[in-house]
């Protein structure tokens, strides 16, 4: 190797070249005389002849040889001739820049990987000599380390390559045959692929899941494997077994001071490092459970009874478990206190694992053998009976022991005479005869009953019956029904009828089940089927949610009925049948949610029974009861209430909110959303908001009509004091007014806004008409409709009248419409103006034709200010003011300033009209805007008269009628764009201010630049000096250029001249485009 390396290293160092020029040197023709080709490639190479045929495969082959030349892939040794060594030297003397080589991306990647590998080797110190850093490790390391696998890092790369991998191990032809078998070593890295393949079988990681870490199915296989290993090791370790036994004993004692043996764990861990093995005590604890569970438990003697049981306090019986196999009991793997079976406040004695769910949670009360001489009743203990029959012997004593408060299962017949307060299960029926009638009532029935009581018809001896089927005594004075009954109780037979009259027992307040018969008390809240009431002193359920059965009468006499009034179910949610009740003092359900049937009442106490305040479903049947003033109707009736008899003297309380059709006996609801039947309504019972069509009311009282009526109401025989709806959107029929005509003279308000057609009625009523709807009785003048004159004296006209008003009324002080867009018909009376009203106002904006019936005595009647039609002639009105802006023919009562009608003597001339010329001298105001040629009087002329005005005061007269003025055309010589010495404004024929008709009148020529020689006042400032005009020369704005140098004309010397000057000397900017 020394000779080879010295030959390479002793070669002269060439200058650095680019990488592409180095690649080009591989593709040069070897026949050419180039030093680089002579050095690198020689004719004795086996693949030198292929370079002349420049096909694709040879190019790829050369690139491959170039890439693997320095990566120790070939097994040829370096020869003495440097030409035979395919070594990539990044630096030649070739100065020509090679063309771009079509190298594949994968080839470029592999070249970069090769450079990276050399750089990593240099950093790791694997390359000993850094004199020639371009020479790869195949030259330096030599052949002392050979590869065992014969492969290379690049050949075994998983990167796809277009070059076959067989070329990696191809040998090159060398001179010495003994060096052909020399292979280049493989460079070792920190993460070698071969080393990773070697440890794949040993370092397989465990698959983690969401399960618990200790999976029993996993450790069963491990345990079998360990047993085989233990059988192979015959001797074993005695210390390990002793330690495990000590651990077991410590676990059973509740002491975990000693840990598992580490030597056994190391042996177990040798098999698999990643297996997280458990020790044998841990596996026994997981598989077999705690030692206290497996160990025998001494059976509790029957004679051993705790003192707490004798005292009556609730206790829990410890379960007796038989001896079982070790492997039979497997407890769950997750637990907090499963090692020692100690009772803690949060953990009691663990029950049997193989027992059923009912047996696990069953805890019954053991009734101890108490002293027979003791007669005191025990306190009720908390017991939960989940349908489990405890076979207990009956105590023969007559004491009254405590019972369970909550009964969730079948009823356990104990020796107690009181039923369970809370019944959640199926309780048996009370069918046995209670022999001891003199027993004191010291216990109560279950308050909550959630089960179905069993019907037990046999009345055998209690000795032969189990505890669950023992019945309670039937004495009603000592037993009460459960407050909450959630089940269906069976028929409860009563044998002691004499005892049923002693004490009043309350029925269950809340009955959630369907009971057939109820012997003692009616529940307050009944959610099921109501049982038959067998006691006359029992109160009905206040809240009934189910269907109550018919109540049976007891055999007691009515005289024995207590006078106490028991309430009926206040809230009835079910359908109750007819109850033959003796104790009629029971109250009716206040909230009735169901359809109640007939309730036969035969007692005078039933007068205090209250009707259901809230009745939701169907229509109840008529209650046959003597009507009383204290009988309450449902306040909120969501159904159709029953019809009361006609014997009701006073008015009952009716529902305020009725959502269904009600009968005639009820008052009209405040909000009626349905169709109500025709009924006799008391006063003040009409609906305020009626969304339907109310029936015809035949009452002679004064009902209040709805304020807002959205529908069409039928005819109502209402009185004069009935208030009409303020806002009426429909078209109600005319209501018949039954009042006298004298009441119509009162002050009556008309509708503010009426958008419909009113009926032509002459009836007098104080009822105002509807707002959006035709009135029924009285028709004041509408706002936006066609009014009909009422016969009343105080009917006011509407402010905005868009229709044609009928003037056949005789109202005295009626005000005309301010904005009347119609032509009112002529009336025969004093409709528009009255004899008595001196402040009558005529139509201000009367677009239509106003009335011609102006009163003769009216002196202050104002005419229409903006009358756009021909108004009627006034009768004898001398100074009546007519419309100021009347564009039609004005009446004789006064002239409209905007009319061209014939004016009277003292009337104003029309403002925009053409009044005929009169000889009168007392014309007040001249026609201000007379466009039709007014022959003016000496009093004043038209201001804007454009046709033939002879008045001197007319400023903008179109033509001049005076003979001494010269009729100069307006736009002849004084046109705008011609040079002139006179102004261009000629409105009144003044001829440019030359002829001045008025001495002191300011002429327009003085204002708009006339010269001083025009005859104007000399002391007036000449505007021509202000606006640039010379003395005596007017300013010509856009005419020909004048001689004055300061004129703003369009001359040749001005800046604004288009011929030359600034604009002529200005160059035009051009867009210069650069050549592209």
UniProtKB/Swiss-Prot annotation:
Residues 19-30, 154-170, 243-260, 634-649, 658-667, 944-964, 1034-1045 have a biased composition (Polar residues). GO terms for molecular function: nuclear localization sequence binding; structural constituent of nuclear pore. Signal peptide: none annotated. Residues 1-11, 708-723, 965-979 have a biased composition (Low complexity). It is found in: Nucleus, Nuclear pore complex; Nucleus membrane. FXF repeats lie at residues 336-338, 384-386, 591-593, 614-616, 636-638, 657-659, 689-691, 753-755, 819-821, 866-868, 929-931. Phosphorylated by CDC28. GO terms for cellular component: nuclear envelope; nuclear membrane; nuclear pore; nuclear pore central transport channel; nuclear pore nuclear basket. The modification N-acetylserine is found at residue 2. The keyword Nucleus applies. Residues 426-439, 488-505 have a biased composition (Basic and acidic residues). FG repeats lie at residues 1008-1009, 1027-1028, 1038-1039. FXFG repeats lie at residues 406-409, 422-425, 448-451, 484-487, 510-513, 525-528, 543-546, 571-574, 671-674, 708-711, 727-730, 800-803, 885-888. The modification Phosphoserine is found at residues 54, 161, 383, 637. It is a peripheral membrane protein. The keyword Membrane applies. Present with 468 molecules/cell in log phase SD medium. Functions as a component of the nuclear pore complex (NPC). NPC components, collectively referred to as nucleoporins (NUPs), can play the role of both NPC structural components and of docking or interaction partners for transiently associated nuclear transport factors. Active directional transport is assured by both, a Phe-Gly (FG) repeat affinity gradient for these transport factors across the NPC and a transport cofactor concentration gradient across the nuclear envelope (GSP1 and GSP2 GTPases associated predominantly with GTP in the nucleus, with GDP in the cytoplasm). Contains FG repeats. FG repeats are interaction sites for karyopherins (importins, exportins) and form probably an affinity gradient, guiding the transport proteins unidirectionally with their cargo through the NPC. FG repeat regions are highly flexible and lack ordered secondary structure. The overall conservation of FG repeats regarding exact sequence, spacing, and repeat unit length is limited. This is Nucleoporin NUP1.
């Amino acid at each position: 190797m020394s000779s080879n390396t010295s030959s390479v290293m002793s070669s002269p160092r060439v200058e650095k070249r680019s990488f592409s020029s180095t690649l080009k040197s591989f593709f040069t023709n070897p026949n050419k005389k180039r030093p680089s080709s002579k050095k690198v490639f020689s004719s004795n190479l086996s693949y030198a002849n292929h370079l002349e045929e420049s096909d694709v495969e040879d190019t790829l082959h050369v690139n491959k040889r170039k890439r693997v030349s320095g990566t120790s892939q070939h097994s040829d040794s370096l020869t003495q001739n440097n030409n035979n060594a395919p070594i990539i030297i990044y630096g030649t003397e070739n100065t020509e820049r090679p063309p771009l080589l079509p190298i594949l991306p994968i080839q470029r990647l592999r070249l970069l990987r090769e450079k990276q590998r050399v750089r990593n080797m240099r950093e790791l110190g694997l390359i000993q000599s850094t004199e020639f850093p371009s020479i790869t490790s195949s030259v330096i390391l030599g052949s002392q380390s050979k590869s065992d696998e014969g492969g290379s890092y690049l050949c075994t790369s998983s990167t796809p390559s277009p070059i076959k991998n067989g070329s990696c191990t191809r040998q090159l032809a060398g001179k010495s045959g003994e060096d052909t078998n020399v292979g280049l070593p493989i460079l070792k890295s920190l993460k070698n692929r071969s080393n990773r393949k070697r440890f794949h079988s040993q370092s397989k990681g465990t698959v983690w899941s969401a399960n618990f870490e200790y999976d029993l199915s996993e450790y069963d296989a491990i345990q079998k494997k360990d047993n085989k290993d233990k059988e192979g090791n015959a001797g074993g370790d005695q210390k390990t077994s002793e330690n495990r036994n000590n651990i077991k004993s410590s676990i059973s004692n509740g002491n975990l001071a000693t840990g598992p043996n580490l030597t056994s764990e190391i042996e177990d861990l040798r098999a698999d490092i990643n297996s997280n093995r458990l020790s044998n005590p841990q596996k026994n604890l997981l598989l077999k459970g705690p030692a206290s569970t497996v160990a025998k438990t001494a059976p509790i003697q029957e004679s051993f009874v705790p003192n707490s049981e004798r005292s009556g306090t609730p206790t829990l019986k410890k379960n007796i478990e038989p001896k079982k196999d070790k492997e039979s009991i497997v407890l769950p793997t997750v637990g907090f206190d499963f090692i020692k079976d100690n009772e803690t406040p949060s953990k009691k004695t663990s029950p049997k694992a193989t027992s059923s769910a009912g047996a696990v949670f069953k805890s019954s009360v053991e009734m101890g053998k108490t002293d027979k001489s003791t007669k005191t009743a025990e306190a009720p203990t908390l017991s939960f009976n989940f349908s489990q029959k405890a076979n207990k012997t009956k105590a023969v004593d007559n004491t009254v022991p405590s019972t369970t408060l909550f009964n969730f299962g079948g009823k356990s017949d104990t020796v107690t005479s009181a039923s369970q307060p809370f019944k959640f299960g199926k309780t048996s029926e009370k069918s046995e005869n209670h022999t001891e009638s003199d027993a004191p009532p010291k216990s109560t029935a279950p308050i909550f009953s959630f089960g179905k009581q069993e019907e037990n018809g046999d009345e055998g001896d209690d000795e032969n019956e189990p505890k669950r089927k023992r019945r309670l005594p039937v004495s009603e004075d000592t037993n009460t029904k459960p407050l909450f009954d959630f089940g269906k109780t069976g028929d409860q037979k009563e044998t002691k009828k004499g005892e049923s009259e002693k004490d009043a027992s309350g029925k269950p307040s809340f009955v959630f089940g369907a009971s057939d018969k109820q012997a003692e008390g009616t529940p307050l809240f009944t959610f099921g089927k109501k049982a038959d009431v067998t006691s006359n002193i029992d109160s009905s359920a206040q809240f009934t949610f189910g269907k109550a059965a018919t109540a049976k009468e007891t055999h007691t006499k009515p005289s024995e009925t207590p006078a106490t009034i028991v309430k009926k179910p206040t809230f009835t949610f079910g359908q109750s049948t007819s109850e033959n009740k003796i104790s009629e003092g029971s109250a009716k359900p206040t909230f009735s949610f169901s359809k109640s049937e007939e309730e036969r009442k035969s007692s005078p106490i039933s007068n205090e029974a209250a009707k259901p305040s809230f009745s939701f479903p169907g229509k109840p049947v008529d209650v046959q009861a003597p009507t009383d003033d204290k009988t309450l109707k449902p306040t909120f009736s969501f159904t159709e209430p029953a019809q009361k008899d006609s014997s009701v003297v006073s008015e009952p309380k009716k529902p305020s909110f009725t959502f269904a059709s009600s009968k005639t006996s009820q008052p009209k609801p405040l909000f009626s959303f349905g169709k109500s039947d025709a009924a006799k309504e008391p006063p003040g019972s009409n609906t305020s908001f009626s969304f339907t069509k109310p029936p015809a009311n035949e009452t002679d009282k004064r009902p209040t009509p709805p304020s807002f009526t959205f529908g069409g109401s039928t005819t109502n025989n209402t009185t004069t004091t009935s208030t009409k709806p303020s806002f009426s959107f429909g078209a109600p029929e005319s209501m018949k007014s039954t009042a006298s005509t004298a009441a119509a003279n009162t002050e009556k308000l008309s509708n503010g806004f009426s958008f419909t057609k009113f009926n032509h009625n002459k009836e007098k009523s104080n009822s105002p008409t509807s707002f959006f709807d035709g009135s029924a009785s009285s028709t004041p003048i509408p706002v936006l409709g066609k009014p009909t004159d009422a016969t009343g004296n105080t009917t006011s006209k509407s402010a905005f009248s868009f229709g044609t008003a009928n003037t056949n009324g005789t109202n005295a002080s009626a005000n005309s419409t301010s904005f009347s867009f119609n032509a009112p018909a002529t009336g025969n009376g004093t409709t528009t103006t009255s004899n008595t009203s001196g402040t009558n106002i005529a139509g201000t904006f009367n677009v239509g034709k106003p009335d011609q019936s102006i009163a003769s005595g009216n002196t202050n009647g104002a005419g229409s200010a903006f009358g756009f039609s021909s108004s009627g002639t006034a009768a004898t009105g001398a100074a009546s003011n007519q419309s100021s802006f009347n564009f039609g023919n004005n009446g004789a009562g006064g002239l409209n300033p905007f009319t061209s009608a014939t004016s009277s003597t003292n009337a104003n001339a029309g403002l925009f009209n053409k009044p005929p010329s009169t000889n009168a001298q007392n014309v007040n105001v001249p026609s201000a805007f007379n466009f039709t040629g007014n022959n003016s009087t000496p009093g004043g002329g038209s201001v804007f008269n454009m046709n033939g005005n002879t008045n001197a005061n007319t400023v903008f007269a179109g033509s001049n009628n005076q003979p001494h003025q010269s009729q100069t055309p307006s736009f002849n010589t004084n046109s705008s764009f011609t040079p002139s010495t006179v102004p261009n404004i000629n409105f009144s024929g003044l001829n440019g201010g030359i002829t001045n008709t008025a001495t002191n009148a300011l002429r327009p020529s003085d204002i708009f630049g006339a010269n001083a020689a025009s005859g104007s006042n000399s002391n007036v400032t000449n505007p021509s000096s202000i606006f640039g005009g010379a003395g005596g020369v007017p300013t010509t704005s856009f005419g020909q250029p004048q001689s004055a140098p300061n004129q703003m004309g369009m001359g040749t010397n001005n800046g604004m001249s288009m011929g030359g000057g600034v604009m002529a000397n200005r160059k035009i900017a051009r867009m210069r485009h650069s050549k592209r």
